[in-house]
């Protein structure tokens, strides 16, 4: 494990332990941000912990986190942090929240780590080195028929009849099984071969930077609604190779 990945794993584990101290706490303080989403002391303290560790080890590296102002990079390296992906789940005592951290070098994400502290699961990947869950290699599933696939959607609109004719939206009517697991947890189900597709319609860089290398190194693919692999796109789709390739072909034909 290279030093950058080792540092990312250590930070994700330390931040995870910090969040567990707040998890299911009845006296948890909850605040509302300008975008009307919730944030807790655990979110802020976990991000501060990771940001401080990065500054200590790599003072010229940049840091982009969900909760605080970006610290610009002076060397082309930028760490991207989501201290608690799934804050609403965290607040309600649902153990599916994740601590996410990625390293981007010259605009390309090189590694990603996602820790699920309440589950005891740690996913990580580095470009060209495969993807792992708790130290064991993982791969996406080989299911190629969408009628046999499990598709996960985050937004409640997918349970309604008024979805668009976009190929990704149409999965709801074609899939063998549709479920509503959101946030990074759903995408890790794809990476580990337990689901075939996971869809998030609204994503920020800190929501997806860590999960993209894990899914792709597990043999899958990630792209937005335009079919582009990016951390700054229009939503995010994670899929196994077979179904992802078919989806991309359908998007290109639109």
Residue locations for each model-derived region?
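Acidic active-site catalytic centers that drive phospho-/nucleotidyl reactions
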Residues: 41-43, 47, 66, 82-85, ...
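Short loop segments at secondary-structure junctions
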Residues: 104-108, 118, 127-130, 136, ...
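An extended, acidic
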Residues: 139-254
């Amino acid at each position: 494990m290279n030093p950058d990945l080792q540092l990312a794993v250590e930070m994700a584990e330390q931040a995870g332990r910090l969040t567990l101290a707040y998890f299911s706490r009845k006296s948890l303080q909850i605040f509302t941000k300008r975008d009307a989403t919730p944030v807790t002391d655990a979110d802020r303290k976990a991000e501060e912990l990771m940001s401080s560790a990065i500054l200590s080890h790599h003072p010229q590296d940049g840091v982009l986190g969900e909760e605080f102002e970006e610290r610009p990079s002076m060397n082309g390296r930028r760490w991207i942090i989501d201290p608690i992906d799934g804050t609403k789940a965290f607040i309600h005592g649902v153990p599916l929240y994740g601590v996410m951290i990625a390293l981007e070098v010259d605009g390309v994400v090189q590694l990603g780590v996602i820790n699920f502290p309440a589950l005891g699961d740690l996913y990580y990947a580095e470009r060209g080195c495969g993807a792992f869950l708790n130290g064991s290699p993982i791969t996406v599933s080989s299911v190629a028929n969408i009628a046999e696939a499990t598709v996960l959607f985050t937004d409640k609109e997918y349970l309604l009849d008024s979805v668009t004719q976009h190929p990704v939206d149409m999965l709801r009517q074609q899939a063998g099984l549709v479920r509503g697991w959101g946030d990074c947890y759903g995408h890790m189900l794809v990476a580990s071969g337990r689901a075939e597709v996971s869809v998030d319609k609204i994503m920020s860089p800190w929501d997806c930077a860590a999960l993209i290398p894990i899914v792709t190194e597990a043999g899958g693919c990630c792209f937005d609604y335009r079919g582009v692999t990016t951390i700054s796109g229009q939503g995010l789709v994670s899929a196994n190779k077979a179904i992802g390739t078919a989806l991309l072909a359908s998007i290109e034909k639109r």
